[in-house]
Amino acid sequence: MTKQTLTQLEQHDLFLRRHIGPDSSQQQAMLNYVGAESLDDLTAQIVPESIRLSQELSIGDSCGEAEGIAYIRGLAKQNQVFKSYIGMGYYGTQVPNVILRNVLENPGWYTAYTPYQPEIAQGRLEAILNFQQVSMDLTGLDLASASLLDEATAAAEAMALAKRVSKAKKANIFFVADDVFPQTLDVVKTRAECFGFEVVVGPASEAVNHELFGALFQYTNRFGQITDFTELFAELRAKNVIVTVAADIMSLVLLKSPGAMGADVVFGSAQRFGVPMGFGGPHAAFFVARDEHKRSMPGRIIGVSKDARGNRALRMAMQTREQHIRREKANSNICTAQILLANMASFYAVFHGPDGLKTIASRIHRFADILAAGLQAKGVSLVNSTWFDTLSIKGLDVAAVNARALAAEMNLRFDADGTVGVSLDETTLRTDIDALFDVILGAGHGLDVAALDAQIVAQGSQSIPAALVRQDAILSHPTFNRYQSETEMMRYIKRLESKDLALNYSMISLGSCTMKLNAAVEMIPVSWPEFANMHPFCPLDQAKGYTQLIEELSSWLVNVTGYDAVCIQPNSGAQGEYAGLLAIKKYHESRGDAHRNICLIPQSAHGTNPASAQLAGMQVVVTACDKQGNVDLEDLKTKAAEVAENLSCIMITYPSTHGVYEESIREICDIVHQHGGQVYLDGANMNAQVGLTSPGFIGADVSHLNLHKTFAIPHGGGGPGMGPIGVKSHLAPFVAGHVVVKPGRVSDNNGAVSAAPYGSAGILPISWMYIKLLGSNGLKKSTQTALLNANYVMKKLSEHYPVLFRGRNDRVAHECIIDLRPLKEASGVTEMDIAKRLNDYGFHAPTMSFPVAGTLMIEPTESESKVELDRFIDAMVSIRAEIAKVESGEWPADNNPLHNAPHTMADIMDPEFDTRPYSREVAVFPSAAVRTNKFWPTVNRIDDVYGDRNLMCSCAPLSDYE
């Protein structure tokens, strides 16, 4: 009993051994199999010596879960959560506990991946279809996206759409009304500058005085005014102007829809529907347009199709618009969006139903009426004559009001011109109105909420003009009218969850996606009120905990990347790419080299790379790769020399998208630098770098980091994500700034790329916890274990499938690519067949046909145990044996378990199944592991072509429920 030291006994709580899947004995067995003595020996065999770090990271020691929680609890306590009336797109909300516990805090929802495999994602696809239905009903338009990143970036996407579809082809002006939220205008201006658009800002009525391709209006505006735009929109549309509207989702419950006024595009934040402010995010933006603009929509769209049995099935529609297919010609670079938050918003609408939403919205509006009536009774002047939830007040002693507000622990909006704003929300109580009277008027005002309410009821309210009161029904679909009891809601959420395969069931080995453990201990702080309920524009001295957390996380990321500074603002990897390219662009401009606009991109690059380059106003020149998948150095030298005068940068991924450490990476950086360019190193594969090498050490100038890959933020079924960028010192002055929050950095006055100054700050505690708990040694060991797992899988599968690319010593990095093209030629079995057959074995498919068509790219991550790796390997070996039966003719090419996969309960219940040349057991219980823990796909293979030819992106018709 005394063999272990006290130090060893104290380490039982260390997170490291919980995060890494293989235990020490499993690791040794795997090392023996791949032919390495230790993790360090394997690392030396794989990572080129020239780029290997000689020093350890300086993060600190690994720690236990209890210690990590205690430390971050101390940070949380430094935040002062005042009652917020700031508004400006961020509002207090009540997260229904049934959604908090069963969605936000449920790994069945937050660990899933984007539904590229729809047969095992029907649950979240239905939830997102509900979100699209909510968006369409409230905006009065035809087609909604599955979510965008935030309201401000949605505005930039609306501007881009307007230019694409406007018939005013010669126009180059985008008009923005001067009463939109300032952060929205900031992001629009940043995007417009890249596109070469002119942005004109002025009173809404002046839009008709310009030759425009598009215009943007806020409904209700930043001051709270509600305007009937019907005549203005008609006049603009007669001039071929695309009319876009930023709308408040809660107000639309009561107000005439922008679509009914004639808008072409309506967007906004769904945050008010049960998603905490989170110091700026994450929140889902809704984006809705007329049907005629569907091919120009940004982001994912969920559509209805049918499966092989003719049953209704959901899928991602019209994917040919998106970056992973169209690359630099895509409508947008958006990849990860905000699916988890969109799910929360859709469930909020389902749980409350139309009547509940009307009650919530009416209560907010009634409190605004009461506040206005009391203030006006005391002679206070309002800027706005109409309102839903926001009052803008003039003529106050601002200093005195602010002092009383801070003493009462509340934050109001204080504009530069002396206007004071008050925005009410779902959390507002009667006592809050009393407190607001005290703060605005001082003590002794004599106002009584009940008396004011009685007066309003007796006289009626005129604050929403009669012409702007919504007359049409909303959310009449049965889904929004049957789950208002918590029992029914809980079961509905569970019913949808059970249709989806997430990390809580099995490994998701998607190459280039890094589906590692999202540990419970990392997730816990996210829903703490000290982090969840902070307004992003609150005084910074109230956010000392957030400030310290962001500073510590930034310093750790600087250490990990080898850069000099980090910008946290980008709220997705694609936005990080855009932000990094903007920094390069601004840097060249500062040196008088504005003409440098060519971006070199290897042909193997992620689709977001060329899409982001196009977004940043750059011209893409593609460079070749050799047969080993490496950048063709001779072609790079030739291209770099040809465009040297105008070379802006290269975008390159490391390790390469082919899953190997290119030996010539430093030479690649040198070639670009010699011709005056900068090196953008895509951080998608950072999970193979941390602690072993770094972008800065390699020679890159800027990278984005996918916190939702390398640093443990969950994918959420398609978001949230975070894409902060690391930069060398010469680029630091050119990273994103923010028009509202200026913490005193050299980059403060630069344009923003996201609505909030720190992006989706509410999920930063996840990555902070991940790094804090693992420490320097744990981070390095995680990377080394990722390499071990990948090489173990690669070597095992290489006995049955060709492995397409290998690096030094016949090794791969953190992922491997198996080549299915020879099998397809010999048997007719496709990569799609294998992907769907894996569903029958209880697995999500690896990445299909990227970066090479006809392949599968497998990334197991460090979190998977040898037991799980072996289960996946056994499935792939079994599938190879099935393919052999097709090759031999034992099974027909058009009637076999692969061609017919995935199999459902309906299949094995079908009497006609007996005509198939394989048994029911082979179909649905192909392995012993599946027999004891079966995941059932709920639909058969989905017909993608039918879905796009018969586009339907709303809930099922009522007849389906009759």
From Swiss-Prot:
Keyword Transit peptide recorded: no
Membrane listed as a keyword: no
Cofactor list: pyridoxal 5'-phosphate
Disulfide bonds: none
CDD domains (UniProt xref): GDC-P
Reaction catalyzed: N(6)-[(R)-lipoyl]-L-lysyl-[glycine-cleavage complex H protein] + glycine + H(+) = N(6)-[(R)-S(8)-aminomethyldihydrolipoyl]-L-lysyl-[glycine-cleavage complex H protein] + CO2
Alphabetical list of InterPro entries matching this protein: GcvP (IPR003437), GDC-P_C (IPR049316), GDC-P_N (IPR049315), GDC_P (IPR020581), PyrdxlP-dep_Trfase (IPR015424), PyrdxlP-dep_Trfase_major (IPR015421), PyrdxlP-dep_Trfase_small (IPR015422)
EC number: 1.4.4.2
Molecular function per GO: glycine binding; glycine dehydrogenase (decarboxylating) activity; pyridoxal phosphate binding
A biological process term (GO) from this entry: glycine decarboxylation via glycine cleavage system
Highest taxon listed in the record's lineage: Bacteria
Residues where N6-(pyridoxal phosphate)lysine is found: K709
GO CC list: cytosol; glycine cleavage complex
Residue stretches in coiled coil: none
Keywords attached to this entry: Oxidoreductase, Pyridoxal phosphate
Role: The glycine cleavage system catalyzes the degradation of glycine. The P protein binds the alpha-amino group of glycine through its pyridoxal phosphate cofactor; CO(2) is released and the remaining methylamine moiety is then transferred to the lipoamide cofactor of the H protein.
Subunit organization: The glycine cleavage system is composed of four proteins: P, T, L and H.
Family assignment from sequence similarity: Belongs to the GcvP family.
Identification of the protein by name: Glycine dehydrogenase (decarboxylating)
